[in-house]
Amino acid sequence: MLSENEIKILEYLSKKREASAEDISKQLNIPIESVFSISQLLKEKGYIEVEEKKVIKYELTDEGKRRLKEGFPEEKLVKLLDGKEKKIHELKDKLGRDFEISIGWAKRKGLVKIDGDTVIPLVKDYEAKEEKEALINPEKANKDILQQLLNRKLLIKKEEKILNIRLIREPLEIKPALIFLTPELLASGEWKKYALREYNVEAYPPFYPIGKKHFFKEFLERLRDLMRDLGFKEVYSDYVEIEFYNFDLLFQAQDHPAREIHDSFAISGKGKLTDEKLIQRVKQIHERGWKYNWDVNISMRLMLRSQTTATTARVLASRPKPPIRVFTIGKVFRPDSIDATHLIEFHQLDGLVIEDNFTFRDLLGTLKEIFNGIGIKEIRFKPAYFPFTEPSVEVYGKIEGLGWVEMAGAGLLRPEILEAVEISSSAGAWGLGIDRLAMLLLGLKDIRLLYATDIEYLRNRKVEINADN
């Protein structure tokens, strides 16, 4: 079956037998690019032979067009001299920017000579006839003249592809292709005059590279949606934090190893905290519980937060009225060697529930709801120790192909923390590393792929967090 343009080209070649692609394009009013592609199709169908040639073409530059219109500089110089000697400054004033070019080419062609500051003509008249003819018809020009014009940047040389197309097989019967089969064509029988296009029902639809979210960003948004659906409100805080919220309010002693330089990023300068009552309560609780002299200056040091629990600590410090259910998703920063499983900045999800009579059993049920929502149906809990919760558990989820994998840490907030913020209700908290969770759920072996920028890779990535899996 032949398309409309294929038929046009074959009918034209039936008369001409042979023609260039450029000629076909002009005569049939078909874009030259379409002629190239249609020629390839007709060649594959055995109707034509295609011979490709490369030819050199010359084009006038803007300067070349100016010379054709205004004349060559050396012509102007000879005309100004009019067979008489003249001073250089006088000619320079009249010729302007063309003066240097005119002197150079006039000397090279033997039209003038220079004596001190005087230009002496050697000819009375001069016309650059050969150069002008070469600009008009460069293909027939003398090689030396042509090279001169190229050197003077009056012409540019281009290599063009020319297709010569020759008919080798006449089509037995040419029927135009029918794109739309209408009821009228069926009723009248007109459809028989056309070739019906065959359809490949197994062919894939065309691919359109439309914009899409980065797959890890989409993963984070799905987690946010899940937490909101479970009745949690999202809270935020800055990356730069004071140690008070990152450690002290969470009953982490000032000599704890996690506060050393190799486990957190320090920032020069000090922060501020105006809640003197809260500062004094934290001081008393630390000195009573850990038996050391608590230093407020240490707690005011700036750092890049090492855990998003610093955000929920700020919620606690605001002394909220129960019931409250909040979560935060954000970046945290810890010194480490970057490899397939470690980064120095990564994402965490922290949650906090404050309710009257909230029990450890309620906490485990909440965690099970969250992980079921992510798509992890089998959950186990293992007793653990964390500085700011008691009792505490580690959460393990069963991942296909990997078995039981640690997913999160959780527990009821220690009474020392609740005492510091004057909250009498029970509170449960948990935190999980989102980047490693994403690696497990998305089947990645390198954590760095979560931040990939390769367009093809991102285009083909999919995100599936399905509670029904």
Curated annotation (Swiss-Prot):
GO terms for cellular component: cytoplasm. One of its GO terms (molecular function) is phenylalanine-tRNA ligase activity. The keyword Cytoplasm applies. Its cofactor is Mg(2+). It is found in: Cytoplasm. Gene3D superfamilies: Bira Bifunctional Protein, Domain 2, Winged helix-like DNA-binding domain superfamily/Winged helix DNA-binding domain. L-phenylalanine binds at T309, Q348, L349, D350, F388. Mg(2+) binds at E390. Keywords: Aminoacyl-tRNA synthetase, ATP-binding, Cytoplasm, Ligase, Magnesium, Metal-binding, Nucleotide-binding, Protein biosynthesis. Its EC number is 6.1.1.20. Binds 2 magnesium ions per tetramer. One of its GO terms (biological process) is phenylalanyl-tRNA aminoacylation. Its main location: cytoplasm. It is an enzyme of class 6 (ligase). It holds the Pfam family TrmB. HAMAP family: Phe_tRNA_synth_alpha2. Belongs to the class-II aminoacyl-tRNA synthetase family. Phe-tRNA synthetase alpha subunit type 2 subfamily. Tetramer of two alpha and two beta subunits. This is Phenylalanine--tRNA ligase alpha subunit. It comes from Sulfurisphaera tokodaii (strain DSM 16993 / JCM 10545 / NBRC 100140 / 7) (Sulfolobus tokodaii). The gene is pheS.
